[in-house]
Curated annotation (Swiss-Prot):
Protein name per its UniProtKB record: Methylenetetrahydrofolate--tRNA-(uracil-5-)-methyltransferase TrmFO
Binding site for FAD: 8-13
SUPFAM superfamilies in the cross-refs: FAD/NAD(P)-binding domain
Listed transmembrane segments: none
Biological process annotations from GO: tRNA methylation; tRNA wobble uridine modification
Biological source species: Thermus thermophilus (strain ATCC 27634 / DSM 579 / HB8)
InterPro entries per UniProt: FAD/NAD-bd_sf, MnmG-rel, MnmG-rel_CS, MnmG_N, TrmFO
UniProt-listed Pfam families: GIDA
GO molecular function: flavin adenine dinucleotide binding; tRNA (uracil(54)-C5)-methyltransferase activity, 5,10-methylenetetrahydrofolate-dependent
Length: 443
């Protein structure tokens, strides 16, 4: 059997390689460190954690908690390492960085079916390949991707607006409309002059996230953060993302002084983004400001806005829910490159890409988890989200169908957690060949 290529030994690549090895498929794992380091990494270890050491909140009311549980059920190497290297962090799963990456490196390099190649990959390798090169993908490989799929399908920075859960929006304070009577695809949150004045002042006073040196970027005029627009003058936002021109509030028959527009992000209409509100503000500040917007006082934020260096694909244009490229059979993407955010999400997509690469090598059809599971919801978002202005995503409850019946928020989340884990477990049990138990991958 020919070796399957895995490019990149971060969390996604490590999990992809491990999944392939568990199914008896030989792997050639490419990692350019230490021959060529990135601005963010400091070692040559696999799955090096370079930012926060947290893999997200735990528990049955947390979306990341469901993804953690699914990955444990799947026999994830990343979750195995996280559980062994965990440190006290309240309700979150945090790890000792060195112990975590050291454990993963040792487990992988000790496997007889793994070949490690310490060199930069400058072209897409022939044969079955998983690309998991992360936010700091080398320029040469990025250029190769552009030549293959078009430069408009690859982004070099992440300028994302916050996304809120539709069910948490107060629709009595909003109206549906498009500008000048066009299709009513947008939700509009109108503001009075006094509401706008307070909102503008709060934007000026809000604290910004301080990026790492390697995250810093030059602003493109089409993607200036909303707080920077506010600094340019009192009226700048009124001629930009908050302009009311062509939007008539049916309750007053007039254009409001200012308006915040929301656009549907997923086919099911569960998630809506604030149009033109890309931001680098700290998350508590984002929450405070969003709750100043009429109709969003109690909005549940499922994804905060970000502004940072990030190389990722326009997944809805290029990938299916199996993480295989639509126009390149046997080529898969995982992790940040595939359009997810977060350590856990990267590892989870690495698992699925590795699983389907293994099935390809074994002559079997691809598979995808059920939509009720967090991983299933995540990859369906990647495959079906609006490709115009596509934003990377992390685990959140807006990715999975809501549960029926009247219940409180906590009970609803617990019901979604149990339903998702049950569906994911049933899917795992139905895989043929089955995934070996984790210890069975050891030789």
């Amino acid at each position: 059997m020919e070796r399957v290529n895995v490019v990149g030994a971060g969390l996604a690549g490590s999990e992809a390689a491990w999944t392939l090895l568990r199914l008896g498929v030989p792997v050639r794992l490419f990692e350019m460190r230490p021959k060529r380091m990135t601005p963010a990494h400091g070692t040559d270890r696999f799955a090096e954690i370079v930012c926060s050491n947290s893999l997200g909140g735990e528990g049955e009311t947390n979306a990341k908690g469901l993804l953690q549980a699914e990955m444990r059920r799947a026999g994830s190497l990343v979750m195995e390492a996280a559980d062994l290297a965990r440190v006290p962090a309240g309700g979150a799963l945090a790890v000792d960085r060195e112990e975590f990456s050291g454990y993963i490196t040792e487990r992988l390099t000790g496997h007889p079916l793994l070949e490690v190649v310490r060199e930069e990959v400058r072209e897409i390798p022939p044969g079955i390949t998983v690309l998991a090169t992360g936010p700091l993908t080398s320029e040469a490989l990025a250029e190769a991707l552009k030549r293959r799929f078009g430069d408009h399908f690859l982004a070099y920075y992440d300028a994302a607006s916050p996304i809120v859960l539709y069910e948490s929006i107060d629709l009595t304070k909003c109206f549906r409309a498009g500008r000048y009577g066009q299709s009513a695809d947008y939700l509009n949150c109108p503001m009075t002059e006094e509401e706008y004045r307070r909102f503008h002042q709060a934007l000026l006073e809000a604290q910004r996230h301080t990026p790492h040196d390697w995250e810093k970027l030059e602003f493109f005029e089409a993607c200036v953060p909303v707080e920077e627009l506010a600094r340019r003058g009192y009226q700048t936002l009124l001629f930009g993302p908050m302009k009311p021109v062509g939007l008539v509030d049916p309750r007053t028959g007039k254009e409001p002084f200012a308006v915040v527009q929301l656009r549907q992000e997923d086919k099911a209409g569960r998630m809506w983004s604030l149009v033109g509100f890309q931001t680098g503000l700290k998350w508590p500040e984002q929450k405070r400001l969003i709750q100043m917007i009429p109709g969003l006082e109690n909005a549940e934020i499922v994804r905060y806005g970000v502004m940072h260096r990030n190389t990722y694909l326009n997944a809805p244009r290029l990938l299916g829910e199996t993480l295989e490229f639509r126009e390149a059979e046997g080529l898969y993407a995982a992790g940040v490159l595939a359009g997810v955010e977060g350590y856990l999400e990267s590892a989870a997509t690495g698992f699925l890409a590795g699983l389907n690469a293994a099935r390809k090598a074994l002559g079997l059809p691809p598979v995808a988890p059920p939509e009720e599971s967090m991983l299933g919801g995540l990859v369906r978002y990647l495959a079906t989200a609006n490709p115009e202005g596509f934003q990377p995503m992390y685990a959140n409850w807006g990715l999975v169908p809501p549960v029926e019946g009247r219940m409180g928020k906590k009970e609803k989340r617990q019901a979604m957690y149990r339903r998702g884990l049950e569906a994911f477990s049933a899917w795992l049990s139905g895989l043929n060949p089955p995934l070996p138990r984790p210890e069975a991958a050891l030789v």
